[in-house]
Amino acid sequence: NKTGNKLISKPDSNDSLNFYLILNKTFNYVESKLGIYPINNMVLSKFNQDKDPVYGLNNIPELLNPFDNTFIQEFSVLKLVISSYLNNLYPIHKRKNYWQLKGIEVFLLIDYIEKYYPELNLIGKFSKLSIIKNREYSKFKFNDQYRIFDNIITSRNISQPIDSPIDSLTMINHKVINPYKSGLALKMADDFIGDQNVLKSIYEFSIDNKLISSDKTFIDVFYKNNGEKIAWFINYLKYDNIIDFSVKKIESIQNNHKFLIKNNSGISLPLKITLKDLNNKSETKWINQFKNDTIINVNSKNKIIINPDKYFSEY
């Protein structure tokens, strides 16, 4: 049971107390993003957790798990609370708009880790082992898992468009990849637009559509708030082909460098780039969506990294 933003419980052991603290922390976070949960009871069951698990965390034997049990429980409960909100309160068509359910869920999971565990490594405590700590993969953060899985599937050419109806998705895309791609797409849009725009649109959609019958979708609210600034995003949801950008230095005069960035894809997208100089100092900027080629001039910086956050997989 819960009241306001507090959960009512009577911990009678250390385990119960730990769970109570975890439940309060995760519930209060979700409530801050989605508003008050208007139903008196929220059921968080082992059955629901097993039906929609945290892939990876719930499948590792305890002896080999790089995370402590408290974190695993916290992240699993967080996912259950978000899922309870989204599935119980909103008029989201679960077949047609599956990406909205899972995209919002993954977006909030990413946001939670950024807020509470920004330095958490993907391989947890194993990243400190002497035989591993100098390996490249030991530097991956926990939130890198979403783009790593996406990249693996994209490289095998079995990915599907983000907004595919649920009954058209293959098992791996249904369970893992499309939710991850959806969350990363929202993260990319949030970064591009700025001002926590996606979080604000999620909250607005939540407040306006809780426990009512409505044809309005999250994307309707998102488009209302941003208009043509997210026309590329609507197209990206339906895109079913490779994404491929390339960069080439075409001119260099003293400290002034000219780069040609080619869009070899069939879609116009904004592109995030990181510029670095000889001292490894860097700055990051966005190039507005373009479909073919664009030329940029930069002073002092002599190296460009495209798509540094890997919001989408490239060939």
Predicted stretch roles:
Residues 42, 230, 243, 250-309:
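Beta-strand-rich binding/interaction modules
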Residues 34-38, 84-89, 108-120, 193-197, ...:
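A generic secondary-structure signal for well-formed alpha-helical elements
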Residues 13-16, 168, 294:
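Coil residues (strongly favoring Ser/Thr
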Residues 39-45, 95-96, 119-124, 200-202, ...:
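Surface-exposed patches in mature extracellular/periplasmic domains of secreted proteins
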Residues 70, 96, 102-184:
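Acidic/His/Gly-enriched intrinsically disordered linker/tail segments
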Residues 38, 166-251, 257-259:
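Amphipathic alpha-helical substructures
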Residues 2-98, 104-112:
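Juxtacatalytic substrate-recognition/specificity segment
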Residues 312-315:
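Glycine/proline-rich low-complexity spacer/linker segments in large multi-domain proteins
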